[in-house]
């Protein structure tokens, strides 16, 4: 069976379903690497992507974001000039009640009898204004970090915004963006 549209799973409307010891057949996470780039260096700026509203991000989208951002930064900045971290983990188990369709489907389908559903994937639950991912870079590579965040926003189910922080953790988004436009 194919992958369902993401709009089915993006809302946080059901209770959390995370206790894997009670779930038979729960799939494992597709995303395994959460830190990329130069993990030991100190960088001047932190660019973080925040969620504008509560949402669920499927593990397929997280893996696509990881591949896209990492590849873009490696190509434009170089492996030793950034640190990229995904800050959310897909704990939420997604379920689907497969419905039988077609001719004589009523003979072998259950319909809504026992409709709890089978596990089909995982998702990360994100609260409003929570950091989804972060890139640490120096000032000369800041525009590439912002480009990477723009590419990551396209793969999210709902809108997001980015913030730029200095080493002390102060929000310097407006100051940095005003100097970059000149």
Curated annotation (Swiss-Prot):
UniProt key word Metal-binding = no
Task: Tell me the Pfam families matching this sequence.
Answer: Ribosomal_L16
Its keywords, alphabetically, are: Ribonucleoprotein, Ribosomal protein
GO cellular component terms, semicolon-separated: ribonucleoprotein complex; ribosome
Q: Name one GO biological process term.
A: translation
Q: Which GO terms describe its molecular function?
A: structural constituent of ribosome
Q: Does the keyword Disulfide bond apply?
A: no
Q: Which InterPro entries match?
A: Ribosomal_uL16 (IPR047873), Ribosomal_uL16_arc (IPR022981), Ribosomal_uL16_CS_euk_arc (IPR018255), Ribosomal_uL16_dom (IPR016180), Ribosomal_uL16_euk_arch (IPR001197), Ribosomal_uL16_sf (IPR036920)
- What is the superkingdom listed in this entry's lineage? Archaea
Record SUPFAM superfamilies? Ribosomal protein L16p/L10e (SSF54686)
Family under the similarity heading: Belongs to the universal ribosomal protein uL16 family.
Q: Which PANTHER family match?
A: 60S RIBOSOMAL PROTEIN L10
- What protein name is recorded for this chain? Large ribosomal subunit protein uL16
Question: Can you name the source organism?
Answer: Thermococcus gammatolerans (strain DSM 15229 / JCM 11827 / EJ3)
Gene expressing this chain: rpl10e
């Amino acid at each position: 069976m194919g992958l369902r549209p993401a709009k089915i799973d993006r809302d946080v409307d059901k209770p959390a379903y995370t206790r894997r010891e009670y779930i038979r057949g729960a799939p494992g996470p597709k995303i395994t690497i959460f830190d990329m780039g130069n993990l030991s260096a100190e960088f001047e700026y932190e660019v973080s992507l925040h969620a504008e509203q509560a949402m669920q991000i499927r593990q397929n989208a997280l893996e696509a974001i990881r591949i896209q951002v990492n590849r873009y930064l490696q190509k434009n900045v170089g492996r030793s000039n950034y640190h990229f971290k995904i800050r959310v983990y897909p704990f939420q188990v997604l379920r689907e009640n497969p419905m039988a369709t077609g001719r004589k489907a009523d003979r072998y389908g259950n319909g809504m009898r026992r409709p709890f559903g089978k596990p089909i994937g995982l998702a990360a639950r994100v609260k409003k204004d929570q950091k989804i991912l972060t890139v640490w870079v120096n000032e000369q590579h800041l525009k590439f970090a912002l480009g990477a965040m723009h590419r990551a926003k396209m793969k999210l189910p709902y809108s997001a915004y980015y913030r730029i922080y200095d080493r002390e953790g102060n929000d310097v988004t407006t100051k940095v963006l005003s100097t970059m436009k000149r």
